Structure formats: structure tokens, C-alpha cells
């Protein structure tokens, strides 16, 4: 019913945020032409340690293998907002390893290494921008259209390299 309600109000898809959705949902998304992103519930996963890969990779690869044949899935996103934890910076190699594993399992779809920040290796530069003033929001992205540069609150930690851009939050 959620998909039908979403379609009825004009949406054609959704970011399945921080959750591995049931196959039944994906079946109906396929059937109804509703596009979705496959994500992983990474809250409380401390990405500042090298061994954080062990906390995500087994289930993440299982999800990709299970859901690979669903045409409704248009991309993958294993992490969300990999903020530094307790003053420790994220372990960039962990994100890189998970990104590369994702691309090895499914080279046909784009992968966002982490939704929001801090990007290491990504096909789509995903931004979280909560600006509520439409004029200021427009200013943030005008240069992307005219000069190919991107407003980024986190430019000191990540580099925009001309990737497609997605304001997901």
C-alpha cells in the first residue's frame, strides 16, 4: 500500500533509508515501476576503525546478492553520514573497501559510498542540505549548473570531482 500511496501523490520512487527492505516490497516496487535505492542500516557502526568493515560487509554482500535482480533498485548506498566518532576520523579505507566490493558484486548500478559525507570513492556525490530558505538553497547549487563547482560544507574532508550530484536529505 505504501508504494501505491506514494505513486498516487506523484512520487516515482524512494530512498529506502537505513534499512534492508523485504523482498515482498521490492517485488511490488518492480511490478509497479517504483524506483528505489538499496541501503544498509549502519547506525552505531563506528567507521573510525579498520575492523568496521567486518560489521557491514557480510550482510551488505548478502543484500546485494539477494536483491541484484530487482529492476526497481537503481543504486546502492552502504553507509549514511559517516561522521567522525568521539574525535576519531572515519577510516577511509573501510569505505573504499565496501565501495569496491559493491562495484565488484554489481558493476551495473551506481554506488554512493556514504550518503552525505565524508566521500572517499563514489559514483554519485550525495549531499545533505537542510537549508530551508529557497533562495539560499538555490545559491548552493547555481555554480554546479554554471561552473561545475559544488557548494560543500565539508570541502575540507572530501573533494567533488564532477560526479553526478544527489541532494538526498
Mark where each language-model region is:
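Glycine-rich phosphate-binding "P-loop"
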Residues: 1
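Substrate-binding/catalytic cleft of secreted carbohydrate-active enzymes
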Residues: 5, 13-169
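Metal- or metallocofactor-binding catalytic centers and their adjacent structured scaffolds
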Residues: 9
Amino acid at each position: 500500500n505504501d508504494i501505491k500511496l506514494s505513486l498516487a501523490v506523484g512520487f516515482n520512487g524512494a530512498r529506502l533509508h537505513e534499512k534492508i527492505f523485504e523482498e515482498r516490497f521490492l517485488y511490488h516496487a518492480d511490478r509497479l515501476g517504483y524506483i528505489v535505492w538499496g541501503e544498509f542500516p549502519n547506525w552505531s557502526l563506528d567507521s573510525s576503525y579498520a575492523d568496521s568493515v567486518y560489521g557491514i560487509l557480510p550482510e551488505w554482500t548478502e543484500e546485494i546478492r539477494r536483491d541484484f535482480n530487482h529492476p526497481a533498485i537503481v543504486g546502492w548506498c552502504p553507509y549514511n553520514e559517516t561522521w567522525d566518532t568521539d574525535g576519531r576520523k572515519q577510516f577511509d579505507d573501510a569505505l573504499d573497501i565496501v565501495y569496491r566490493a559493491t562495484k565488484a558484486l554489481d558493476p551495473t548500478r551506481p554506488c554512493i559510498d556514504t550518503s552525505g559525507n565524508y566521500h572517499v570513492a563514489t559514483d554519485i556525490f550525495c549531499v545533505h542540505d537542510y537549508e530551508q530558505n529557497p533562495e539560499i538553497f538555490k545559491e548552493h547549487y547555481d555554480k554546479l549548473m554554471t561552473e561545475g563547482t559544488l557548494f560543500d560544507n565539508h570541502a575540507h574532508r572530501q573533494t567533488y570531482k564532477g560526479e553526478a550530484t544527489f541532494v538526498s536529505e
